Curated annotation (Swiss-Prot):
This is 5-methyltetrahydropteroyltriglutamate--homocysteine methyltransferase. It catalyses: 5-methyltetrahydropteroyltri-L-glutamate + L-homocysteine = tetrahydropteroyltri-L-glutamate + L-methionine. L-methionine binds at residues 435-437, 488, 603. Belongs to the vitamin-B12 independent methionine synthase family. SUPFAM superfamilies: UROD/MetE-like. L-homocysteine binds at residues 435-437, 488, 603. Catalyzes the transfer of a methyl group from 5-methyltetrahydrofolate to homocysteine resulting in methionine formation. Pathway: Amino-acid biosynthesis; L-methionine biosynthesis via de novo pathway; L-methionine from L-homocysteine (MetE route): step 1/1.
Length: 775
């Protein structure tokens, strides 16, 4: 029989219950027992939503208090020794691993965090050593599975596969071949399967998303040997791939001794024919035909026609599902009461997407007539979107068509600009700055909420925001920072803020998705041509600059990041949408410069995450991404200093594209990786200024002055002294004021020590060392 199933459901809860509960636990306001009870309630709610929608096989094990990769590491005992020694409680150990601090007060350096493939979700990077051992260490998956079965759900446990788990981790200390760990790891996986089998589970979903990557031959071979060795203890295994095409890994995937294969049709429709021709006759094919990464409703008529053709070949060996876990979309469109009615009709969130998969499955089982009403209603929606006049703006399209190369070049090369900027800005050696945002207190959030709800008028709102800006400027001046920011109190999110002010973009009320841990974001929805009708940031930056003689940065989010962190229209190339955004930002940049702003930051933290997973597609993306950044940034004079910021990025393979952005200063996230990211600059002489993140803002832990100095000295191995900036890893929005002021004070002290220790006339040698400074 054709089944509807799902790969994973959002964890955060319809009202972000996960976020509120876990943060209460971190603050010591609730017990661990209360924490676990909320986990039970959230999972039961998620299972009920899916079952009522008509999903046959319910994913179990997709819930997490922080991250599913971290959960897998804890489950198999891959816990770094620095956490094992300090925590006896497994839950606190997990939180300490992710945050560098546990609710029991234990502190140490957190594990690295990075992007989950090309999404805006972040995972905690497992750490492996040459003497790594594994053991079954956590029973969370078995408890959840038992709970689902007791509540009469047909549970399909979900785990990250062994090869993807190893691939996503990193060697700590001495480098070695991670595949050597399989011998110790596979028995633990077998133990997991044995326990799931004993509970009466029929199917297990094993996620191996790295099968859509360019894999080295030894990793391809490792798939064959690993899955031949794995003992599933009579469980049926659905091997799940997503985010791209199997491509050259298709043949080996079809040889694996598993019972079913899931493919992502939405991201890689061209692979379908090859999969159908190579899939062994006994295997199930799960077709991910409902987009798990975007919010547009499915064209059910078109999808059903495609599935009917597949069914004619496979019969009951066809399953229907979303393309990937629904972790990447909001939970329930029914919670949106303020969206324009026509726009809302075009969307589908997680609850609606599992219903779409179920509708299609029913159509296959019982014939089109059984879902005739749904098909008719859906067809009306599809036509409405295609013919709506609100999507196209002739003025925007004309402006985009007129873009030429001249608009994407600064007046002179960086060396000339550098001299002019140095004379104008009068900055010291090792200039200090922050990335943009300052702590968003409950007072600020309540102020914005009251303003949006009409409880306070424009005048009072402006007065209160100005007070916040003045306070932030005063704190930075007192701390001794060199280039200041206004703190962004008016912004709820670095992308959503611009989404609210640009035409062609819609904002939801409850469209939250998980970014990392308890951090949730509300991505804008780009539904039509994008344009700027009026200045978006000017009044706040002008006011901030009026309070100080030091330079205050204009703060913008770049075109690629706005694109990456939004749900994007799918009726034109993404590059075209990015160009429209870049033109809107260009107007804003020029307005800021005309007002006297001397430093303008255009953040592109998502620049690398948008890189296609397959290298063959990189050149095309990098070409248009670089052009869009330059289109946004190059309309200014030499004297205006352009900054950009990037995070969670490995630069080795795209360093030339980073240089091609031609930003005067780039700040990058690097502290968690202990400056490893700077190895990119060993063989490539990056020509412009760099500010490698000198402390980790994602952890509440405050670094010692000596630690900051040590990282800066390490950075000087790769960056000439006259080009090195001192700054945090990222924005400070999620930190509290006590942490922020103390950490920045230490950062400024470290910069002062560095200025004393290093001559401004000479570039230091690599082996020059500082004595540890006191804190």
């Amino acid at each position: 029989m054709v089944y509807a199933h799902n790969l994973g459901f959002p964890r955060i809860g319809i009202k972000r219950e996960m976020k509120k509960t876990v943060e209460a636990y971190w603050r010591g306001e609730i017990s661990q027992q209360q924490l676990q009870q909320q986990a039970i309630e959230l999972q039961l709610t998620n299972w009920k939503i899916q079952a009522e929608a008509g999903v046959d096989l319910i994913p179990v094990g997709d819930f997490s208090w922080y991250d599913h990769v971290l959960d897998m590491a804890v489950r198999v005992g891959a816990i770094p020794s620095r956490f094992k020694a300090l925590n006896s409680n497994i839950t606190d150990t997990m939180f300490c691993t992710a945050r560098g601090q546990a609710p029991n007060g234990i502190e140490t350096s957190a594990c690295e965090m990075t992007k989950w493939f090309d999404t805006n979700y972040h995972y905690i990077v497992p750490e492996f050593t040459t003497n790594q051992s594994f053991e079954l260490h956590h029973d969370d998956l078995f408890k959840s599975t038992k709970l689902a079965l007791e509540n009469n759900y047909r549970a399909k446990p979900v785990i990250l596969g062994p090869l993807s788990f190893l691939w996503l981790g990193k060697c700590k200390g001495e480098s070695f071949n991670k595949l050597l760990l399989l011998e110790k790891l596979l028995p633990v996986y077998a133990e997991i399967f044995e326990q799931l089998s004993s509970l009466g589970v029929e199917w297990v979903q094993v996620d191996e998303p790295i099968l859509v990557l360019d894999l080295p031959p030894e990793w391809q071979q490792a798939f064959l040997t690993t899955y031949q060795q794995l003992n599933f203890f009579n469980l049926k295994c659905l091997l799940a791939t997503y985010f791209g095409s199997l491509d050259d890994n298709l043949s080996l995937t079809c040889q694996l001794p598993v019972d079913g294969l899931h493919i992502d049709y939405c991201r890689a429709p061209d692979q379908l024919d090859s999969v159908l021709s190579q899939l062994p006759a006994e295997k199930i094919l799960s077709v991910g035909i409902v987009d798990g990464r975007n919010i547009w409703c499915n064209d059910l008529n078109r999808s059903l026609t495609l599935l009917e053709n597949i069914q004619s070949s496979l019969g009951d060996r066809l399953w229907v599902a979303p393309s990937c876990s629904l972790l990447h979309v909001p939970i329930d469109l029914d919670q949106e009461n303020k969206l324009d009615v026509e726009l809302k009709s075009w969307f589908a969130f997680a609850k609606q997407k599992v219903a779409e998969a179920a509708f299609l499955t029913r159509g296959l089982r019982e014939g089109r007539e059984s879902i005739g009403a749904e098909l008719k209603k859906n067809e009306e929606v599809i036509i409405s979107r295609k013919t709506s006049k609100r999507i196209h703006n002739p003025n925007v399209e004309k402006k985009a068509a007129s873009v030429n190369e001249r608009l994407m070049r600064r007046q002179h090369e960086h060396s000339i600009r550098k001299n002019k900027q140095t004379a104008q800005l009068n900055l010291p050696l090792f200039p200090t700055t922050t990335i943009g945002s300052f702590p968003q207190t409950s007072k600020i959030r309540c102020l914005r909420r009251d303003y949006k709800q009409g409880k306070i008028d424009d005048a009072l709102y402006e007065e209160k925001i100005r007070q916040e800006i003045a306070e932030v400027i005063g704190i930075q001046v007192k701390l001794g920072l060199d280039v200041l920011v206004h703190g962004e109190p008016e912004r709820n999110d670095m992308v959503e803020y611009f989404g609210e002010l640009l035409d062609g973009i819609a904002i939801t009320s409850n469209g939250w998705v998980q970014s990392y841990g308890s951090r949730c974001v509300k991505p804008p929805i780009i539904f039509g041509d994008v344009s700027r009708e009026r200045p978006m940031t000017l009044r706040w930056i002008e006011y901030a600059q009026s309070l100080t003689t030091k330079s205050v940065k204009g703060m913008l989010t770049g075109p690629v990041t706005i694109l990456a962190w939004s749900f994007v229209r799918d009726d034109q190339p993404r590059s075209q949408t990015a160009k429209q955004i870049a033109l809107a930002l260009r107007d804003e940049v020029q307005d800021l410069e005309r007002s006297g702003v001397r430093v303008i930051q255009i953040d592109e933290p998502a620049f690398r995450e948008c890189l296609p997973l397959r290298k063959a597609a990189w050149q095309d993306y990098l070409e248009w991404a670089v052009k869009c950044f330059r289109l946004a940034s190059c309309g200014v004079k030499d004297e205006t200093q352009i900054h950009t910021h990037m995070c969670y990025s490995e630069f080795n393979d795209i360093i030339e594209a980073i240089a091609a952005l031609d930003a005067d200063v780039i700040t990058i996230e690097s502290s968690r990786s202990e400056m490893e990211i700077l190895k990119s600059f060993e063989k490539f002489a990056y020509p412009n200024d760099i500010g490698p993140g000198i402390y980790d803002i994602h952890s509440p832990r405050i670094p010692r002055v000596a630690e900051i100095e040590e990282l800066a000295v390490r950075a000087l191995q790769y960056i000439p002294i006259e080009r090195l900036w001192i700054n945090p890893d990222c924005g400070l929005k999620t930190r509290n004021w006590e942490e922020t002021k103390e950490a920045l004070s230490r950062m400024v002290d470290a910069a002062k020590h560095l200025r004393k220790a290093f001559s401004s006339e000479k570039t230091p040698t690599i082996d020059l060392e500082l004595q540890p400074a006191s804190t």
